[in-house]
Amino acid sequence: MPQAKVVLPAPNGLDEELMGLAIYKLNELGTLEGNEIGVYTAERPDNVPEDCPDNMVFLEFRASVIPYLGRR
């Protein structure tokens, strides 16, 4: 199965709000398969705005998805 990933800033660490946002973003990419979502520390993305603090932690969320094949 294909893997989808999203990288999000985590100013408060891993909390329920961030997990909910990650699930929402992953669901935009396809139907989540299974019950597992991997959470990893991520490198700072290149396209981060200048006003984002240098010490901001980013988390990468990965999940197996069934991609959407129809038109959107």
Swiss-Prot record:
Domain of life: Viruses
Name of protein: Gene 42 protein
Organism annotation: Mycobacterium phage L5
